[in-house]
Amino acid sequence: MSIKISPSILGGSFSNIERIILDLNQSKAEYIHFDVMDGDFVPNLTFGPKFISNVREFSNKVFDVHLMINRVEKFLDDYIRAGSDIITFHIEINEDI
């Protein structure tokens, strides 16, 4: 069995996000985990597909995107186009997936 490490950038400072991603690019981690929160499904608010797209410009790591949002079906294609490689979401709130 092979273990994959997927560090989350959520704990980092968004004012220093480029440095965080560049450091992760130099690490042995194969994945970068993004916790996307909409302020509705969960009380916190993080970032959207444009942020994923911007980060994709300077990283070739696997983007592991965790959508903690309502109406995943409305936004799924946006996150795919943004450069997500893996998308995880909560099925209990999405009837049309």
Model-predicted regions and their roles:
Residues 90:
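Conserved residues at the C-terminal ends of beta-strands
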Residues 1-82, 86, 94-96:
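Conserved N-terminal beta1-alpha1 strand-loop-helix module at the mouth
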